Amino acid sequence: MSATPAVLRASACSACRFSALRLFVSSFASPRAPLPVARTRVLSPTAPYSTFRPSPRLLASPSSEEHAEPAAQEQPNKTEDAQAEASTEANNEGGADVPWYLQVDAPTHPTLVHEPPPLPDIPEGSPKLMEPLVKFVSDELGMDDLKLLDLREIDPPPALGPEVLMLFGTARSERHLHVSADRLVRWLRNRGVTAKADGLLGRNELKTKLRRKARKAKLLGTTGLPSGADDGITTGWICVNLGTLGWSDMEMEFKDEKGVTSGFGVPQSGTTLVVQLMTETRREELALEKLWSGILRRSLERQDKIAGKLPEASFTTSPDTVSGQSFSPSPIRSSGRNRKRPDRLYFSTSARQHAAAVDVSQTDLATAMAGWEYSNASPSTIDNLLAQDTDSKVQLLIQMQEYLSSLPRDQALSAVSLCEDGSPSTFMRLFNRAIENLPSAQAWEARLWVEKAARALQHPDHDLARLGDLIQEMKLSGAANVSREKFVDLLRMIFAIPETTDAGVRQQASLSMDVIDMLFSRGEKVIEYDVVVAVIESLLQTRARPPEARRLLSQFEDLLSEAQMDCPTEDEIIRLLDVYANHRAWDKFWNVWRVFPRHCERRTERMYTKVYERIAAEDHQGMATDALRWCVEEMWHEQPPVRVTAAMLKALEACIRIADPEAESLAKDIDDRISDAQYMDREFVRLWLTLHGSAAWGA
């Protein structure tokens, strides 16, 4: 019995689904035993019954039932009792034969009835339009997951306007998004509010773009836009700005606390309403609620600091708060001039600058900055130095890097850790102060350096969750000027954290995709050797690898051998050779060794030296013999030929001693055995003599 389209449509309802299931199951059930024949009864004729529903016009005229004889109504009580008894018996006997669409559903428990989620609370002092607006967006437009943010405490107010109230809603699809935004704009227009909807495609505009897209796809065939490319139609986000309600354009006089006139101007009054409509994926990607909540939190913290509610020593900077992990310090580049970030709020009075000063004692400075250029400076001098001078900040950060790298491991861990009371250490307070108001690229490079340093020290607090927060912050702040090397370092840090469960590996893969997405959004290639090598190198450095990690490693190794990528650098090849040699994966070791010839590139002296050193360290006669026979011959045929350096000669001698232990002694005594040809024919004796003959001009 096949399912008809009508049955499939009916399966959308839970009750219909259950009834349809009974209908299908009944066809496979065993036949029921025949029921006993009931005693025949003489029943009175029943009133005619029809399932036809008359129209209003037909209801106005007498029905056919009204013209029927009222004999059934005049039957004696005895006949009615017999009819009721017969009906009851018939129902009991043939209840199972009633079709499902005539059966009465059981009453539903109140807890199973779907109730719409509650609407967000309206803040006090909101405009009168706020409550009907929330109801319209929820009930009429059908937006899900409504959230209302009260951003009226942000000081100074954002560019959207003063006293911002922001409503968020999730649309079910792209079409639902545009239709809902268009209806919202028209609804507001009927109430005298002119709203501006950024990202909205009007009805005619959307149809025109769809026609053009279909025509272009027909002309291009399969060579059109790739999946996921920007087609100019899919936005996923519409910002409906209602403007500032209650705005006054009257100029007024401002007076200070003493009643003295301090100026004239237009007051910032009224409330700005903004409705953010997004699809579910776009809302998760942008995370605007988190962004605006962070802006509000930082504004309140800044106001509390100015008012003296927080201690000055607990200084943190957002979004430049240090969170980190690391590998090796790298120098920070100076911009060469003092630039200010446009998204920063600067203090305009000396009193506010004093409130933001770093409160560290001279003893702490002497301890933390021992051996630095500014070790004997006073706290006020350090604070003035770190005020706005970008070059001085960069120089101080470089000295801090050198200082941290010179410390023993225990002291370095203490420098990047929190104190017992939960406050940052003196080193971290100075670091936070130094990166404040730096250009975005330099600030992020400094923060990533601290992250690498903490990861190299295996700091317990710098785990995968903290690294995920840092990556999310980079996405929100738009770290567009960070170099590609820093993103590759982030990938190394992600997979260098040991994970023993499949869930942890999946989280690592998700974070790595966030980093790769940031690279892709900058227009850079993502499937390149630096990215693939960073992931493989980090995965192979972890000892315990769950099945998900092994599967991920296999996928990246397939990319290494099959993807069409540009030729890797010398350092990338050497790192892969080292990591495969450490794990004794010699087949993959030699596959990496052949990458340069595939790109018609010459292998360098460093690469040959690395191969000979790794083979000699393995101390295996067969491997040493094969390496000498293959690699030495290839070395002579490189264009131009590879010269034998002192380090390479030392590694080659070690390989020859492993392949033929007597070759060295025979080669040294060859002058005494010049008449004996058997020693001259030995393969590695000739190689020893050749190498020492070439070492004089190749060293």
Curated annotation (Swiss-Prot):
Q: How does it sit in the membrane?
A: Peripheral membrane protein
> Is Transcription given among the entry's keywords?
no
Where does it localize? Mitochondrion inner membrane
Annotated region (Disordered), positions in chain: 46-95, 310-341
| Lineage: superkingdom | Eukaryota
Transit peptide, start-end: 1-31
For this protein, the record's Pfam families field holds: RsfS
Q: Quote the protein name from its UniProt record.
A: ATPase synthesis protein 25, mitochondrial
Gene Ontology annotations of biological process type: mitochondrial gene expression; mRNA stabilization
